[in-house]
Amino acid sequence: MMYRTSGTQLNLDYTTENDFIKKFKLANSLVPLSIALFANSSIVEKKDSKYLSYRSKVWQETSRGGLPEIFLENIDFEKYADFVMDYPILFLKKDDKYLSGKNYKFSDYMNGNIQEINKSLPSIDDLGLHLSTIFTENRLKQYIELRSMDTCGWNCICAGPAFFTGLLYGNLDEALEFISKWEKKDLLNAYKDAPMKGLDTNLMGKDMIYWISNLLKIAEKGLEKRDFIGKSGTNETKYLEHLNKIINNKETVASHVINKFSKFQNLEDLYDK
């Protein structure tokens, strides 16, 4: 499954608990937009899957994935820890052997209630292993891990970090204010629709193009505020050009691929010669 659902993952730091609360809420609220904007998994086994992001559709149907409603709230470290403790264990590792989690929760492990391992208690490594098997759209480790983007070409791979860096690092408060009226039920509905509808996904009565175009402006201001100058003498805003092109043309990479595939019915024509 991992080989067939390749994604671009992004790790971003936080400075304080309050900083984490803000960044995590924003990152999770942007998941439907991220799915729509970075969609690039439409062809499956040489056929049009009828989804723009088949990868996202697959992960939404797993028992350990998804976008928990609590992630759209102001979740702090304690609430996230409670979420982790209440999450079923996928597997245990003891003496270099892997054992089934058997529907135990990590809280059972913490309380020494797992008979199969003689009621032993978990180590930090055991907690790290458990955290690595929570496949939500975003998750907390020593950093915030963003996981909702499809893998794509070089321009797109650079654009993702630039977009989220501009918002979460450069212009966090303005971005949060912009999304402050979004309702959880609308976000969750958009999350379900985005893999198939892409930029046409409805959120609060407007399509993704409206929301993303405004967020791109906020991200651009954030990157300009950071003013990180590269060897070329330009700042990070240049990496947003690919996303602006998608919005201006109203065509994601997935849509472009579907159009070419529909015309030629040949995967080879999707690659530059």
Language model features by range: what are they?
Residues 1-139:
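Loop-rich catalytic cores of soluble enzymes, especially ATP-dependent carboxylate-amine ligases
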Residues 72-93, 209-236:
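An exposure/low-complexity boundary signal
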Residues 137-139, 143-232:
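Substrate-recognition/cap regions that form aromatic- and gly/pro-loop-enriched pockets
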Residues 219-273:
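C-terminal amphipathic alpha-helical interaction region
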